[in-house]
Curated annotation (Swiss-Prot):
Residues 1-10, 1725-1740, 1808-1818, 1933-1961 have a biased composition (Basic and acidic residues). Pfam families: Ank, Ank_2, Ank_4, Death, UPA_2, ZU5. This is Ankyrin-3. Membrane-cytoskeleton linker. May participate in the maintenance/targeting of ion channels and cell adhesion molecules at the nodes of Ranvier and axonal initial segments. In skeletal muscle, required for costamere localization of DMD and betaDAG1. Regulates KCNA1 channel activity in function of dietary Mg(2+) levels, and thereby contributes to the regulation of renal Mg(2+) reabsorption. Residues 11-20 have a biased composition (Basic residues). It comes from Mus musculus. The lineage of its organism: Eukaryota, Metazoa, Chordata, Craniata, Vertebrata. Residues 1274-1408 are annotated as: UPA domain.
Length: 1961
């Protein structure tokens, strides 16, 4: 049919005839239809209208669109063709293109503004047409560009309907998934389920039988149907086998969903189809919970009728009743209660439904519950009743209801809060008013003594305060520490509350227990307005705290300028003196508050004011190097020469601290440079003592006497020599110091250096003419002193130069140490402001709580002839010591450290003159308490001075000094033992009839005394401490027992003595007063153990030691010093000191008797006459159960009596014995137990009859044992000895469980340990910390010292529990670098190295880098509840030092290892191959082992010789040693070398940190299971390849495993080569249209959607051909990557399955191996290699064929014959395609591939030949590893003839993942282009024969096991410029050389082709 167009086309410029015009129009349309662009354009140029159309309305755009001529369409649109022009049928170009499936045209049209939702005459849209014709891409594009699928045809059919009718399942899926109504993209079947579209669902299920398709969150269509209540689809799905109980994410089933949504019909359907009514989600919700929570009555009723579990609880213990109550669903609550749900059912926190109703304020529900007799006084775990909660949440109606039903108005919580406390704190005046109306007292106190008024003041509730004080609340009520509400509000700065309280008569001068008034607190916090109010109401300016601080002192301390100014205006005394005579100016100077100091000076404060010991503010400023304050003080007339009582001037302090500028300032203000203190010390002496050369220079330049002498005659040179300070010694000698000057005792500097063992100093002195023959007053030369003290190197140096006079001396003579004087004054700046009670909520602000008034007493001990040392008996930092405080930010220095901060004491470094002087010389040995040394002394030993100027390189730094003059491992708050050789032993010593006494050198407190005449002959006594697990049979431990020290191995074992000998062993058990005791076990052979019994009284011992110069401590002293004394007449092989619960024991026989406990006096066991038939030792143990422990673990669920044990266990008595045990304390209910013989169902008697080392098994025996109550005790009878325990528990059934839980905590053995913290500042912001909890470890951790850590804190001994975690928190200016929410934690194990390494950052770099570490038993709670730390340590980080050369000298191994696992910070660089993974895992373990490697070696059963050999082979690097050990272990143990094995051994040596690493995310890649052996993954540890001279080189090549030639132009480290794991090759798009058979001619069912027919595009008079454009068939090589992968995988499986042996004819070639990585290529290079100028287009055709087969630990499928044939065909095509590429010759005749049986052989052959290209591939596996295409690596002296051997190496039959096994040995350094050329001739014949020989040999040996064809392994894809390329060229026997990468030379190689087809066997 033909029509005239509606519009006449515009006339051309030149009129033509009408006939020609219509011809032109038709020709134009024909040209457009045929795609002849030029022709069409010519017509347009000649005047044809671009929009001209034929009689059907078709224009050029329509025609070109239909035929898919994109260029024509684009050009027409550019020439303003109407994009939305419609045909007669209303079709636009977009309709036509969509119908024809012309995707590119559709894109162009839409881009040019075509209306995607245009509708034709019958309402068809482009989307409808594309959907009808199954044009998936077009449908997708239209949907993405706004096409609406809701637009229907006139008959109401949508695109989805037509796609369903036509059966186009992919289009249906696409349309459903893009249904815009849903918020989340869901799979098609889900959408069908949502729309209840059974038809769509049926079609989708027809094509995919799985009805349980999952969405992203794991929901199935049935879940969706359940959600929307779509019964029809649900029925269909269930009929099609949908799982009725399918669990989605969090274990949600469809029944949960339907119940939650209230779809009752759906619930019924699901239950009818067998849904589990009691299914639980991950949180424990059942369908009943879901229905109840949402209040769906009908559903709840249905579920209850079907017996839903009404008692079921969630993870948190919530029942359906709680849920219904929470949602205020009254009807559901009633329903549940009708079904007899317990009304008082509790959650895990003991919350009832009534608590929930009170919380939410649901009045009606609360009423129903109370009517059903819910308990109004039920207590939650924290003691809150519903009334408390109602008061907290301001629910006044519920509150009144509760009171009406008898709720207790005085009920108290755990912390003693009543409802009025809670309401006052929350600020609810109306509730407070109602409570008081109902009789609540406003003056009731909580456990801290606080009333409601305190609470209101604390939370700043002014209205409540007003109401309370008007209604009779006591304004002056005192809480704990005597705090009044006024104190609290003053501290918090609540001026309005302060005003109210003062007006109501509150005393402004009320003081807390530590003497703080409200004014002090306001001053401390800087609240000027509050201070003004207080002063207006008469607050006193002069009241002092216990420390004598006035409010002005406090303001000065905290730098509160405004308050200080106000106080001074109000006439506060600027010179008020505190307890130690400190003025506010002293305090301001100490805390560097310059503005306050200036204010005080302006207001007349005296700069001359001196503290009691004579310190002026200038002394303090000089000590702390506060230049500004010092300058101000001097300007105000401070005397630079003012001295303290000891004669110390400011310049002394500045000199000692090394403050050069301060010294210069003081000297410029006329300070006397030669001023000496009372003992004669000048500033130069102190500079010499501290090695301050820079200060010494200033002093000497200003006229200091170089040879000034102290009273004892010491010159600065003596002092420098004594302390081993080489730099100052050199300086003094350069300035003509007298080298032979003598002290009063006749000591020269040389004597002093010899006494201290400083060889380096001695050498310098001798070079400077020191006389070695000078004698002391006692006639000793330096040599004699050194010899006596056992300094071998010193003796060797001096004996050459000394003239010796022979003398005889007895061995017992002791050397009296000569020590120069030092200064020891300290000054306490602290002000004890007990803030525990007043400010718990301020803990997080970095404000620190002082630990109270400890240690107020100072003791002076006189030490003859040496010096006076200030010694403290208690913790030096917490109390009122004469100490000078720490850094300014640690305002409340109450920590548990041993004093360890440099300036924390004006002790001018009481360095104790080398502690040796006090321990080695008996006449000066102090008693124990004197060793709680002054802080400076300790600090000097531990921490090099913070201000040390680094310009002077210190040849002998403080670390090295330790080894000269003291034993740093004993630096603790205990007796310092570092005896001379003659009085101590390391392991053994000789003794004879004269007897002897020896102290242990390593372990302080160890001593062996052999009295005279007790040893029969000269004997070598040995004594060493050994680890428990070293013994095959360690001593058996009962629960609650633990070793208190290491095992003591004595020798000679079995030695008999003529009388008792004494062995004293230090122990670490905490005795908890008298609660625990020590017993000694002995073992003669290490196999059996028994208790060591030897009683002897003290008098006997004294008599025994008669004539010996030994003193024995009393038992009390032994207890204090924690020493166990063993008295024995013979030596067993081992002693064990065991800590256990104290046991009362006695011999009891048939006559009977009574045993009573001394620990818990009410506990007793009464044995009647005849209970025992013979006399035996019977024991009674009573272990107290601390209430706080019970509360911490169980809350107020239960209370317990002591645990009582009768020993020996499991013994039956002939008559019952009577046990008496005190009743448990009253329970948390707040009601007295009232045990008066009444029925007490809550009181239970528990019993455990297990004995020996078996764990206790508690059972409830209340029912079978009658209990009798006597006063506060319960007695009962028993005829077996066992463990008994009384419990008072509300939930009787839970008693045993709760008891067992508590018991596990109670049996943890307590130890006394110390916390030590090491730090290293990495950069100005970040530092590394290592925290240790040590028992008997050496404190100078060698690893930390080697890594340049400094000790920054050490605690006194603290009680810790075995095996329990210790949580670490950081406050102040330091923040730990942890993931959010994570807490630092490590476990304590006795005698193990408990190390916690972590990093911290400095919050504010402008402030001092100091903070506090708190060690806690519990994790930090989110509730912010106050927690008591077991230990607090204040730390200041060491200064950031730039590493000097020596520090930088890390071994290459270490660097390589660090780089090797840089992927830890760069996850994308995670290693891929198993060899790589194993190597890195080893590397990480090695890097962390440090010095523990030897311990590990011993645990792994390596001999001493093997360990020494590892040391010798790797002398310079700990990491190399560790790595070599692991390598040897894997080689030796093979398959048994598993991660689990390593973990267990590491746990034994207590390297839990490494175990954590092994189990942590670092090792997650590859999901390596613990049972998999390192050897299985690959034999990384074969001997080094030739050419690698040392193990170090192996460590340098971590990337070898990647088999990746690096990019030649890339200079980066190869550690970063792997930036991406993804393959750069993308999967070719699937031609899905070709795969899906067309269903276009299905008959339409009646009433189905109409099918659009295409427009008739035939043109009048046109003779165009109507042939269809046929798409070219897919390129035979363009194989879909995933298909190929599957095929390859299945082929591999087939290969592996079908290689039982080698056929005789040898035709079977190597089986194909799966590879785990892209062969020879890193991903980064692949990415780069995607394109490039060198790449030929045709390479793409072969790319996909050689994609890697990534078989990642999944089983390959069996390959069918068809698949095998398909694969074979692809390979054939690949060969043909390759031979068709230019320059590629094909050796194989095209007809050579005949049968499937040959497939594998030829594939292998093909790969082999592909690899043997002469272009860039190589035979040597080494060369392809080294990343040098074409270059053979010359290894050592070997030539290229080694290649076949190298090729053979990778075949390891043991494992399946062996690619690149030796790659760890290969060198991967980037090479640069070289220009030389080197010939390495190789005989072609030799190489060919060898290669053939090796290959065939391998095939014969290894064929039954999977291995990789050499060719496949060696394929390289790198061109000279690093671009990816496949080298597949082959030239038989040809020799070629071309430019290669190399270091200055090139290699010419011959490539011999091994053709698998030619192999013969």
């Amino acid at each position: 049919m033909s029509e005239e167009p509606k519009e006449k086309p515009a006339k051309p410029a030149h009129r033509k005839r009408k006939g020609k015009k219509s011809d032109a129009n038709a020709s134009y349309l024909r040209a457009a239809r045929a795609g002849h662009l030029e022709k069409a354009l010519d017509y347009i140029k000649n005047g044809v209208d671009v929009n001209i159309c034929n009689q059907n309305g078709l224009n050029a755009l329509h025609l070109a669109s239909k035929e898919g001529h994109v260029e024509v369409v684009s050009e027409l649109l550019q020439r303003e063709a109407n994009v939305d022009a419609a045909t007669k049928k209303g079709n636009t170009a977009l309709h036509i293109a969509s119908l024809a499936g012309q995707a590119e045209v559709v894109k162009v049209l839409v881009t040019n503004g075509a209306n995607v939702n245009a509708q034709s005459q019958n309402g068809f849209t482009p989307l409808y047409m594309a959907a009808q014709e199954n044009h998936l891409e077009v449908v997708r594009f239209l949907l993405d560009n706004g096409a609406s699928q809701s637009l229907a045809t006139e008959d109401g059919f949508t695109p989805l309907a037509v796609a369903l009718q036509q059966g186009h399942d992919q289009v249906v899926s696409l349309l459903l998934e893009n249904d815009t109504k849903g918020k989340v993209r869901l799979p098609a079947l889900h959408i069908a389920a949502r729309k209840d579209d059974t038809k769509a669902a049926a079609l989708l299920l027809q094509n995919d039988t799985n009805a349980d398709v999952e969405s992203k969150s794991g929901f199935t269509p049935l879940h969706i149907a359940a959600h929307y209540g779509n019964i029809n689809v649900a029925t269909l799905l269930l009929n099609r086998a949908a799982a009725v109980d399918f669990t989605a994410r969090n274990d949600i089933t469809p029944l949960h969903v339907a119940s939650k949504r209230g779809n009752a019909n759906m619930v019924k359907l699901l239950l009818d189809r067998g849904a589990k009514i009691d299914a639980k989600t991950r949180d424990g919700l059942t369908p009943l919970h879901c229905g109840a929570r949402s209040g769906h009555e009908q559903v709840v009723e249905m579920l209850l009728d079907r017996s839903a579990p009404i008692l079921s609880k969630t993870k948190n213990g919530l029942s359906p009743l709680h849920m219904a109550t929470q949602g205020d669903h009254l009807n559901c609550v009633q329903l549940l209660l009708q079904h007899n749900v317990p009304v008082d059912d509790v959650t895990n926190d003991y919350l009832t439904a009534l608590h929930v109703a009170a919380h939410c304020g649901h009045y009606k529900v609360a009423k129903v519950l109370l009517d059903k007799k819910a308990s109004p006084n039920a207590k939650a775990l924290n003691g809150f009743t519903p009334l408390h909660i109602a008061c907290k949440k301001n629910r006044i109606r519920v509150m009144e209801l509760l009171l009406k039903h008898g709720a207790s108005i005085q009920a108290v919580t755990e912390s003693g809060l009543t409802p009025i406390h809670v309401a006052a704190f929350m600020g609810h005046v109306n509730i407070v008013s109602q409570l008081m109306h109902h009789g609540a007292s406003p003056n009731t106190t909580n456990v801290r003594g606080e009333t409601a008024l305190h609470m209101a003041a604390r939370s700043g509730q002014a209205e409540v305060v007003r109401y309370l004080v008007q209604d009779g609340a006591q304004v002056e009520a005192k809480a704990k520490d005597d705090q009044t509400p006024l104190h609290i509000s003053a501290r918090l700065g609540k001026a309005d509350i302060v005003q109210q309280l003062l007006q109501q008569g509150a005393s402004p001068n009320a003081a807390t227990t530590s003497g703080y008034t409200p004014l002090h607190l306001a001053a401390r916090e800087g609240h000027e307005d509050v201070a003004a109010f207080l002063l207006d109401h008469g607050a006193s300016l002069s009241i002092t705290t216990k420390k004598g601080f006035t409010p002005l002192h406090v303001a000065a301390k905290y730098g509160k300028l405004e308050v200080a100014s106000l106080l001074l205006q109000k006439s506060a005394s600027p010179d008020a003196a505190g307890k130690s005579g400190l003025t506010p100016l002293h305090v301001a100077a100490h805390y560097d508050n310059q503005k306050v100091a200036l204010l005080l000076l302006d207001q007349g404060a005296s700069p001359h004011a001196a503290a009691k010991n004579g310190y002026t503010p200038l002394h303090i400023a000089a000590k702390k190097n506060q230049m500004d304050i010092a300058t101000s003080l001097l300007e105000y007339g401070a005397d630079a020469n003012a001295v303290t009582r000891q004669g110390i001037a400011s310049v002394h302090l500045a000199a000692q601290e090394g403050h050069v500028d301060m010294v210069s300032l003081l000297l410029s203000r006329n300070a006397n440079v030669n001023l000496s203190n009372k003992s004669g010390l000048t500033p130069l002496h102190l500079a010499a003592q501290e090695d301050r050369v820079n200060v010494a220079e200033v002093l000497v330049n200003q006229g200091a006497h170089v040879d000034a002498q102290t009273k004892m005659g010491y010159t600065p040179l003596h002092v420098g020599c004594h302390y081993g300070n080489i730099k100052i010694v050199n300086f003094l000698l350069q300035h003509s110091a007298k080298v032979n000057a003598k002290t009063k005792n006749g000591y020269t500097a040389l004597h002093q250096a010899a006494q201290q063992g400083h060889t380096h100093i001695i050498n310098v002195l001798l070079q400077n003419n020191a006389s070695p023959n000078e004698l002391t007053v006692n006639g000793n030369t330096a040599l004699a002193i050194a010899r006596r003290l056992g300094y071998i190197s010193v003796v060797d140096t001096l004996k050459v130069v000394t003239e010796e006079i022979m003398t005889t001396t007895t061995i017992t003579e002791k050397h009296k140490m000569n020590v120069p004087e030092t200064m020891n004054e300290v000054l306490d700046m602290s002000d004890d402001e007990v803030r525990k009670a007043s400010a718990p909520e301020k803990l997080s602000d970095g404000e620190y709580i002082s630990d109270g008034e400890e240690g107020d007493k100072c003791t002076w001990f006189k030490i003859p002839k040496v010096q006076e040392v200030l010694v403290k008996s208690e913790d030096a930092i917490t109390g009122d010591t004469d100490k000078y405080l720490g850094p300014q930010d640690l305002k409340e220095l109450g920590d548990d450290s041993l004093p360890a901060e440099g300036y924390v004491g004006f002790s001018l470094g009481a360095r104790s003159a080398s502690l040796r002087s006090f321990s080695s010389d008996r006449s000066y040995t102090l008693n124990r308490s004197s060793y709680a040394r002054d802080s400076m002394m300790i600090e000097e030993l531990l921490v090099p001075s913070k201000e040390q100027h680094l310009t002077f390189t210190r040849e002998f730094d403080s670390d090295s000094l330790r080894h000269y003059s003291w034993a740093a491992d004993t630096l603790d708050n205990v007796n310092l033992v570092s005896s001379p050789v003659h009085s101590g032993f390391l392991v053994s010593f000789m003794v004879d009839a004269r007897g002897g006494s020896m102290r242990g050198s390593r372990h302080h407190g160890m001593r062996i005394i052999i009295p005279p005449r007790k040893c029969t002959a000269p004997t070598r006594i040995t004594c060493r401490l050994v680890k428990r697990h070293k013994l095959a049979n360690p001593p058996p431990m009962v629960e609650g027992e633990g070793l208190a020290s290491r095992l003591v191995e004595m020798g000679p074992a079995g030695a008999q003595f003529l009388g008792p000998v004494i062995v004293e062993i230090p122990h670490f058990g905490s005795m908890r007063g008298k609660e625990r005791e020590l017993i000694v076990l002995r073992s003669e052979n290490g196999e059996t153990w028994k208790e060591h019994q030897f009683d002897s009284k003290n008098e006997d011992l004294a008599e025994l030691l008669n004539g010996m110069d030994e003193e024995l401590d009393s038992p009390e002293e032994l207890g204090t010093k924690r020493i166990c004394r063993i008295i024995t007449k013979d030596f067993p092989q081992y002693f064990a000191v065991v800590s256990r619960i104290k046991q009362e024991s006695n011999q009891i026989g048939p006559e009977g008797g009574i045993l009573s406990s001394t620990t818990v006096p009410l506990v007793q066991a009464s044995f009647p006459e005849g209970a025992l038939t013979k006399r035996i030792r019977v024991g009674l143990q009573a272990q107290p159960v601390p209430e706080e422990t019970v509360k911490k673990i169980l809350g107020n669920k239960a209370t317990f009596s002591p645990i009582v044990t009768v020993e020996p266990r499991r013994r039956k008595f002939h008559k019952p014995i009577t046990m008496t045990i005190p009743v448990p304390p009253p329970s948390g209910e707040g009601v007295s137990n009232g045990y008066k013989g009444d029925a007490t169902p809550n009181l239970r008697l528990l019993c455990s009859i297990t004995g020996g080392t078996s764990p206790a098994q508690w059972e409830d025996i209340t029912g079978t044992t009658p209990l009798t109550f006597i006063k506060d005790c319960v007695s009962f009878t028993t005829n077996v000895s066992a463990r008994f325990w009384l419990a008072d528990c509300h939930q009787v059934l839970e008693t045993v469980g709760l008891a067992s839980q508590l018991y596990r905590e109670l049996i943890c053995v307590p130890y006394m340990a110390k916390f030590v913290v090491f730090a290293k500042t990495n950069d100005p912001v970040e530092s590394s910390l290592r925290c240790f909890c040590m028992t008997d470890d050496r404190v100078d951790k060698t690893l930390e010292q080697q890594e340049n850590f400094e000790e920054v804190a050490r605690s006194k001994d603290i009680e810790v529990l075995e095996g329990k975690p210790i949580y670490v928190d950081c406050y102040g200016n330091l923040a730990p670098l942890t993931k959010g929410g994570q807490q630092l934690v490590f476990n304590f194990y006795s005698f193990k190295e408990n190390r916690l390494p972590f990093s911290i950052k400095i919050r504010d770099t402008s402030q001092e880098p100091c903070g506090r570490l708190s060690f806690l038993k519990e994790p930090k709670t989110t509730k912010g509840l106050p927690q008591t730390a077991v230990c607090n340590l204040n730390i200041t980080l060491p200064a950031h030092k730039k590493a000097e050369k020596a520090d930088r000298r890390q071994s290459f191994a270490s660097l390589a290892l660090r780089k090797r696992y840089s992927y830890l910070t760069e996850p994308s660089m995670s290693p891929q191959s198993p060899c790589e993974r194993t190597d890195i895992r080893m590397a990480i373990v090695a890097d962390h082992l440090g010095l523990s490697w030897t311990e590990l070696a011993r645990e792994l059963n390596f001999s001493v010789d093997e360990i020494n050999q590892i040391r010798v082979e790797n002398p310079n690097s700990l990491i190399s040693q560790s790595f070599m050990l692991l390598k040897k272990w894997v080689t030796r143990d093979g398959k048994n070398a598993t991660t689990d094995a390593l973990t267990s051994v590491l746990t034994k040596i207590n390297r839990i940190d490494i175990v954590t690493l092994l189990e942590g995310p670092i090792f997650d890649y590859g999901n390596i299971s613990g049972t998999r052996s390192f050897a299985d993954e690959n034999n990384v540890f074969h001997d080094p390849v030739d050419g690698h001279p040392s193990f170090q080189v192996e460590l340098e090549t971590p990337m070898g495993l990647y088999c990746t030639p690096p990019n030649p132009f890339q200079q980066d480290d190869h550690f970063s080569d792997i930036s991406s794991i993804e393959s750069p090759f993308r999967t070719p798009s699937r031609l899905s249209d070709g795969l899906v058979p067309s269903q276009g001619n299905i008959e339409h069912p009646t009433g189905g959607p109409p099918v659009v027919t295409a427009e008739d595009t035939s043109l009048e008079d046109s003779k165009m051909d109507d042939s269809v454009t046929v798409t070219d068939p897919a390129d035979p090589l363009d194989v879909d990557e995933s298909q190929l992968k599957d095929l390859c995988q299945s082929e591999c499986a087939q290969c592996w399955a079908s290689v039982p042996g080698i056929p005789n004819d040898g035709r079977q070639a190597e089986p194909l191996r799966p590879q785990t990585r892209k062969v020879g290529m890193s991903s980064e290079q692949q990415e780069k290699g995607k394109s490039g100028p060198d790449e030929e287009v045709t390479e793409d055709k072969v790319k996909s064929l050689f994609e890697d087969i990534q078989l990642e630990e999944v089983e390959a499928e069996e390959m069918t014959e068809d698949q095998g044939q398909a694969m074979l065909n692809r390979v054939q095509r690949a060969e043909l395609a390759m031979s068709s590429l230019a320059g590629w010759q094909n050796e194989t005749p095209s007809g050579s591939l005949e049968s499937p049986a040959q497939a594998r052989r030829l594939t292998g052959g093909l790969l082999d030949r592909l690899d043997d290209s002469s272009d860039q591939a190589r035979d040597s596996i080494t060369s392809y590893l080294t990343g040098e295409p074409g270059k053979i690596e010359a290894n050592g002296n070997h030539t290229a003839e080694v290649i076949p051997e190298a090729k053979a190496k990778p075949y390891f039959p043991e494992s399946q993942n062996d690619i690149g096994k030796q790659s760890i040995k290969e060198n991967l350094k980037p090479k640069t282009h070289g220009c030389g050329r080197t010939e390495e001739p190789v005989s072609p014949l030799t190489a060919y024969q060898k290669s053939l020989e090796e290959t065939s040999k391998l095939v014969i040996e290894d064929a039954p096991k999977p291995c990789v064809p050499v060719g496949m392994k060696k394929m390289t894809r790198t061109t000279a410029d690093g671009k990816a390329r496949l080298n597949l060229q082959e030239e038989e026997g040809s020799t070629r050389s071309e430019p290669k990468q190399g270091e200055g030379y090139k290699v010419k190689t011959k490539k011999e082709i091994r053709n698998v087809e030619k192999k013969t066997h």
